């Protein structure tokens, strides 16, 4: 009998919590997963796999954010290494747009220092509010 068996009581509680979590996670009015990637082959492939896993459970995907993109600059003024990285990143940004059509919500720059503290968080928030319209 359920009322007398502590294991069954615990399992019933776990089942209820799991059902509540599933209901919340699959409710597109309350939940959406956003994935953050870098403009590199492996992180893009990982996010692609994660998105398919999340969608398999009917969990809404809100979009993809591409982080740490080197801002556009006059390549003649850059070191060959940085100029090459910029070119590589442009190719990976195109790949991300192909793999996640209509899902890129923001492209965030590579900042000169780690995002730490109010000033940097404010800059990151501003970049996020610009979304994919930001000029990187």
Which residues does each predicted region cover?
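C-terminal lobe/tail of nucleotide-utilizing enzymes
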Residues: 18-136
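A general structural motif
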Residues: 10-19
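Basic, amphipathic N-terminal segments
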Residues: 1-6
């Amino acid at each position: 009998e359920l009322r007398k068996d502590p294991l069954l009581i615990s399992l019933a509680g776990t089942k209820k919590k799991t059902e509540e979590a599933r209901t919340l996670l699959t409710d597109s009015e309350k939940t959406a997963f956003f994935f953050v990637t870098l403009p590199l082959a492996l992180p893009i492939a990982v996010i692609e796999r994660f998105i398919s896993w999340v969608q398999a459970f009917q969990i809404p995907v809100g979009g993809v954010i591409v982080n740490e993109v080197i801002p556009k600059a006059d390549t003649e003024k850059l070191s060959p290494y940085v100029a090459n990285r910029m070119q590589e990143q442009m190719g990976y940004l195109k790949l991300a747009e192909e793999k996640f059509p209509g899902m890129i919500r923001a492209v965030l720059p590579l900042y000169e220092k780690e995002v730490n503290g109010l000033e940097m968080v404010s800059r990151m928030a501003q970049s996020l509010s610009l979304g994919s319209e930001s000029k990187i």
